[in-house]
Amino acid sequence: KDQLNAALKPYGLFFAPELSTSNRATVGGMINTDASGQGSCMYGKTRDHVLSLTSVFLDGTVWDSFALEEDELEEIKQQAGLIGQVHRDLDQLYTEKKSVIDAKFPPLNRCLTGYDLAHIRDESGRFNLNSILCGGEGSLGFIAEAKLNVLTIPKYSALINIQYDSFETSMRDAKALMDWGPTSIETVDSKVLNLAMGDIVWDTVRSYFPVNEGDPEIQGINLVEYTSDDEEELRAKVDRLTAHLDDVSGQPGKSFGYTVALGAGEINKIWGMRKKSVGLLGNAKGERRPIPFVEDTAVPPENLADYIMEFRAVLDNHGLAYGMFGHVDAGVLHVRPAIDMKDEAQEHLIREITDQVAALTQKYNGLLWGEHGKGVRSEYAPAFFGELYPELQRIKGWFDPNNQLNPGKIATPLLAGVELLKIDEVQTRGQLDRQIPDDTRAAYGSAVYCNG
């Protein structure tokens, strides 16, 4: 993704979905997981920027898919073979199940990735096969080519770095901050901040997080971004928010300080620190390593603070260390609890915690997978989709009747004996690491602890 945006920059353009993994994320991977990230409340997901896809299906068909007007759709429906069938059956499914789809799909910016039934037709009523291909994780066909929409790079930008004396306060304040019309709001907890303070990256951002006499210790921050092509408009937005922050500073449930960064050069220093969060957590010492398995849950932003407090209680009850950061405006926080997967007793925590967190996300009308695809976690799909899950199985069967493409992920075709993968029945790195002698593991510690 970074290479694509570097090529677009001389033309004043960019590919919008902003990922913290942008220096290694591929466009194909973004399409197959329907990736999103910072600024998604304004810019949406990858699907929103895909104009057309060229796909190769198992019967050898090569097909260009894009938004279709009604007459175009009706013409395609008349075709024989897979393409005609898929367009006929998918449109019929959407028509017959629309009320169930509307009720089942939560009102989230992230949506239910992996056969996104809610967007088979767009706001204009156009049918678009890409709604199920984007986020399909390669389970329906092979994406060979994509035509992408690109946007103009905003001329002016500002980042307001707001400090709080508790992480809960930062989350509860984020919903109110959205009323001030920012481009995005990112949050970082004290665990990640303290790790950043011990890293070389802190030298580039230290001045934006000053330690003033009499101030409480920073336990959480919200990074509020504004962008605009009009400098006066941008400054007016910043001035309105900072005036509000001055008025409420120190009040219960509010922030106690802030700084303002102006211009892409300065702002990118702070985003660089935020993007380094996973690496900072991965550099922690000891046998317990941060493990991604409940790392991208999503709930409606108004439920986020209550949900996260219960989520943290689950992790605290297991005595686990963790840090949290993410897209608080979209209701998505990333967390990787530290677990020694070489220890069989700790390995079992993956199942126990995932079951608890899955139940929590349903309690708060959210998702277990809000950003990084379903993968092995697809075993929870039937519980989330309910009566719609058999419809996903039908879709899988149209494209992949013999379960050959990324089997066990998202949905299985309606075949006897074919099941989704289960999170505790797949081989883990910890199981492999147990085979390495202790002295060898100690001698090559840097390699063993590398998280990629």
Predicted regions and their residues:
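Active-site capping/gating regions of soluble enzymes
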Residues: 48, 128, 134, 140, ...
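A generic structural motif
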Residues: 150, 164-166, 226-232, 301-303, ...
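A glycine-rich phosphate-binding loop feature that marks nucleotide/adenosyl-phosphate handling sites
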Residues: 21-28, 111-116, 120, 186-203, ...
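Generic non-transmembrane alpha-helical segments
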Residues: 7, 11, 173-181, 240-253, ...
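Terminal amphipathic helices with adjacent charged low-complexity linkers/tails
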Residues: 65-68, 72-73, 146-151, 171-288, ...
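Accessory "access/gating" subregions that flank catalytic or transport cores
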Residues: 87-127, 186, 192, 255-261, ...
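Short, hydrophobic beta-strand segments
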Residues: 157-162, 218-228, 287-297, 333-343, ...
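FAD-binding subdomain of flavoenzyme oxidoreductases
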Residues: 1-174, 402-412, 416-446
